[in-house]
Amino acid sequence: GCDIGLSLNFDRITYLRPEYGYATRDVNPSKFPSAENDGLFSVNLKTGQTKLLFSFADLSQDLKGVDNTKQKINHIQLSPDGKRCIFLYRWFDNNGVKHSRLYFARLTDGYLALLADEGMVSHCNFIDETHVGGWMRLGGRDGYYCIDVQTGYYRPEAPGVLTEDGHPTFCGRYLVTD
């Protein structure tokens, strides 16, 4: 069985995207934990003990003026070996515009790398232990991309063929999306 899980603050999801959170919960954003005490957590599935892995303060340190109540983590994916993960850090600016970043993390040593930072990242997944694929904006163009998590090098996948966002799954040489 599984021993460790990854999780996030579902009150933030409920507040920012009620259709994805728990709509029956009464959420008060003024009671959100500080940016230093909220973010991506590991959860011991046997004891329920949680540990903050990466805080919103970590993820937004180079950004100016991010409102603590208007940021969230979403779309957490584990690597096939369970030693790495990717996730989206999203925030809304003062004009209500959503911005997204794709992060890669090694769970074994706390290494964190920013993979995509051009404002738009949608659904992503691991292709293998060292490559991530998904729909995002890179080089100023939206599309499916493969990113080498060790080098940051990226290449388009099926340009001109897959022209819309979806929920990708990768298996060997296959890409399945909707």
Q: What are these model-predicted stretches?
A:
Residues 12, 66-78:
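Signature of short aromatic-glycine-proline-rich micro-motifs recurring in repeat-based ectodomains
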Residues 1-4, 8-9, 76-84, 123-133, ...:
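Blade-terminus and WD-like Trp-Asp/Gly-His loop motifs, strongest in beta-propeller folds
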